[in-house]
């Protein structure tokens, strides 16, 4: 006796697998479309009449406005008593970012408010 297959986990169109939600590949020359993640398969005839449209948007060269150094986030943080190794100025702004995995410490970026020299410290 064969067990009945449970109903799908997702309500979706044929772009996504109804079992795991992954994006299904485009139909090819095979008789079935098979989900590469969970192995769910549908008959390729179920995709009949489906239209796939793609578009690529190219931005004009030079269309973005570069930020000046004064506008970056590194100079908007708090200032601490830390001597710049390049110019010797006392006072550096800092900000933190999670650059490594979540179970490791953050990276602290220090920026000299005088000469804009930047250094980092892994904490």
Swiss-Prot record:
Q: What does this protein do?
A: Core component of RNA polymerase I (Pol I), a DNA-dependent RNA polymerase which synthesizes ribosomal RNA precursors using the four ribonucleoside triphosphates as substrates. Can mediate Pol I proofreading of the nascent RNA transcript. Anchors into the Pol I active site to monitor transcription fidelity and cleave mis-incorporated 5'-ribonucleotides.
Give the source species: Mus musculus (Mouse)
Location(s) in or outside the cell: Nucleus, Nucleolus
**Gene label:** Polr1h
GO CC, sorted alphabetically, is: nucleoplasm; RNA polymerase I complex
Q: Which UniProt keywords apply?
A: DNA-directed RNA polymerase, Metal-binding, Nucleus, Transcription, Zinc, Zinc-finger
Where the record places motif Hairpin is 103-104
First and last residues of each zinc finger (TFIIS-type): 80-120
What is the protein's given name?
A: DNA-directed RNA polymerase I subunit RPA12
Q: Entry's Pfam families?
A: Zn_ribbon_TFIIS (PF01096)
Q: Which residues bind Zn(2+) 1?
A: 17, 20, 35, 38
